[in-house]
Amino acid sequence: NAQKQYSSDIRQKAENIVRESRRKEEPVILLAGRPYHTDPLIQHKLSEMIANLGVNVISDDIVRDNSEIETQDIYLIKQWAYMNRILKAAEWTARQGNDIQFVQMTSFGCGPDAFLLDEVRDILHRNGKPFTLLKIDDVNNIGSLKLRVRSLVESLKQTPLRGTTEKFRTTEVFRKKDRNRKIIAPFMSEYITPLLKPIFKLSGYDIEVLPPSDASSAETGLKYANNEVCYPATLIVGDIINALESGKYDLDNTAVAITQTGGQCRATNYLALIKRAMLDAGFGNVPVVTLGLGRKVSNEQEGFELKWQKILPVALNALLYTDTLSKFYHASVVREKERGAAARLRDKYLNLAERPILENEPHKLVEYIHLAAREFNDICMDKTCPKIGVVGEIFLKFNSYAHQHVVRFLCEQGIEVAPPILLPFFMQGFVNRENKEKLLLEKKRIPHFLSDLFYRYIDKRIALFNRTASTFRYFTP
């Protein structure tokens, strides 16, 4: 079709430029960027400027539909087509002689650029090539950009010796022999996080949740993570490195855990960020495992597998339990007769939940919600309050330090907060899967009748918790 023909034509054009440049012994720069950087105004006519310096310019289109180039030695989880093409272009450039160099444009560290730039830099540096990054929108004029490109061009003319190549390094793989390692995980929420330990213990793993983030988390995160990555990622990296540097853990018997959604959110690539930070900090001997559902996990971890068939009922009830407790607390804290009563009840019922989870008795969590509803009713005065919802990136809206305690501030002003809950984040998977299959973006892995059966199972659990919780007079299903 027309699109395939276009891809073929533009790739052949780039290949012709390379052949002709080599015949004439002229330098070539592969100028990579996002699709919108093809607009001359957005890129400030950088491609034209480079050409005026006597250098032939090609784009990452030279590797379009090229199946011979593989990018296996990377930390990055491949998410978007243009990202994958830039990675392949970097790998292709790394294999070429000194007459071909790589320059990448970025604007405002957009989207997953922070992860991508780190990966491209590593690919080139491991193969003894420089990485030139042009942050287009960080300057008021292109004079400084022109100076950087001119410096690269002059170095090409001097044909410097190619640097030595280095092997790809990554953190240790979590093997079957590592099942007894203590697994540390970053803190996320005051609600679900405390219950992770009993859930994991039920599956045979010893997990320890790290303390909530603080100023030192941000400071360490900025030291070891790309400074243009999103704030939650900075905090998570800081928490993990601080823990490993604390001396509290036997590093030969410790592992790190991080969630992985498998979608197009940047959170999917927190794994890459953490591994790179751990290597830079000297903790390459500590394995990293990812937590996800089914095939959404993109990490080699042969020794780590959650027993979903065993833990799913109690894990689902724990999720609904903590979502419900969060609603109870935020409706009560602005109506409590005695200051601190809502927090004490919240903590009480979070502690009570540990034993039913360890004993794999999900029905007891429903019973505790019934008891909690009565106790929360008792501590509340009849009062109408203004109500505000809090939305945002998943870690940001759940983590108090990440959102600078905005929820607590609103509560102190007498405003009832409709808190973020985790359930919708997981339920969207049903909609996403169905639409991806319709658009032929994903193969059908589960028969629809099984998926529908599982959905109805979850829906019944939700209805049960809503009925039970509705005895609390300020509960919103």
What are these model-predicted stretches?
Residues 1-477:
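An N-terminal assembly and electron-transfer interface module characteristic of large anaerobic redox
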